[in-house]
Amino acid sequence: VHTPDGSPCGLLNHISLSCAPLPSEEIDCQMMSGKFKKLLTQLGMSPISSDFGLIYPHKYIPVVLDGRVMGYIDPNLAPKLVNSLRAIKIMQSNTDELYECVPKTLEIAYLAMIEDAETQSAQTKASDEEIKDKFYPGIFLASTPARFVRPVQNLEHGGIEFIGPLEQVNMS
């Protein structure tokens, strides 16, 4: 949607007849956090430790849940983690206790690295204008209320998936 009204364009693009605001939490976030961190670790994420003893490679990208960094993941493993989370979110049929912590309305926005530092240094340096439009890479997960979600058909997993605005513009 191309509208002259400026900043709300992304939200206007997301809103449809089936779009709905989430009035309350689907799952208790405090209870979910610990189990969810275990699940993300099983799917390939390196969790953050409280002793700050781990230093992650520069190329690793953050995994963020509701604004809190849960850990980091190798960019080569990130698509697999995202795909697995989508499958769990859509299927909701596995009886494993860890899978119960994934809400059906979880927003899974994967912002992949555009190019790594070696590729950029091998090519000509980008101008300030080109750099300005790039974003911070990571896997950004949102489970809190007061978000817009809308149902879409996920062709890969054969089910209905609820997506949010950030997720919509970064889906491939």
Where are these regions (language model features)?
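Conduit-forming functional cores of very large proteins
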Residues: 1-172
